[in-house]
Amino acid sequence: MNINKIALIYNQNSKHLAIIEEIKKLYNYCKIEEAEAIIVIGGDGALLHNIHRYMHLNIPFYGVNLGNLGFLMNPLDTKNLSQNIHESTVSILNPLLMQAEDISGQIYTALAINEVSIFRKTNQAAKFRIDVNGIERMSELVADGALIATPAGSSAYNLSAGGPILPLESNMLCLTPICSFRPRRWHGALLLASATIQFKILNTNKRPVNATADFQEFNNITNVTVKSTTDTPIKLLFNKNHTLEDRIIKEQFGG
């Protein structure tokens, strides 16, 4: 990939400043608004926050992992960083578009790269109805909550909640309950990425529910509608021998 203008984002309070200084010497970095790609140094959280902040620029992101898991990141390799970027492969992620309404009628709209989730706000389990493409599919789910995950996000919170990992090119979404109480044996559903999913919260006064789109949280929600959108494609760069698809496969075999 022919990339000449690169911007660099990092946490100035990072404990890895010595490594960051090495990376800073590799390029004559430009302003973010002038960049053809953005390098983000940190972990998955730093990458997600900066994707949300700069996705409107429609340029690719290359993550360098200095965090823990770093599922969406590339391993630290300062010696070959320039070569790795220019030989990198591109993965296109289509985020989820969430529209949520709270008890006052306020409407919120947000994008999620990993997942949209709803969850109980108090000690009482949440109760909600699930519609898919305008058709009621479950009249009442009693659970701590539920989430809808993209393929890229299926190995994160979704996997911890018992949901399956989706191949990146599967064109599907995971609908996964969080600690389902009734129906107790329901483990969720796989849906086409073209599906529109709606959660209708029941007993909102006694059983309040919050909703999140990645790290953005909204309180006292009564309705949540979620669908995948191709209007804002996100481009992630990965080393040619360390692609996101490979990581998703390895994760399923304990890698």
Swiss-Prot record:
It catalyses: NAD(+) + ATP = ADP + NADP(+) + H(+). The gene is nadK. This is NAD kinase. Keywords: ATP-binding, Cytoplasm, Kinase, NAD, NADP, Nucleotide-binding, Transferase. GO terms for cellular component: cytoplasm. It is found in: Cytoplasm. The keyword Zinc does not apply. Its EC number is 2.7.1.23. InterPro entries: ATP-NAD_kinase_N, ATP-NAD_kinase_PpnK-typ_C, NAD/diacylglycerol_kinase_sf, NADK. The active site is at residue 44. Belongs to the NAD kinase family.
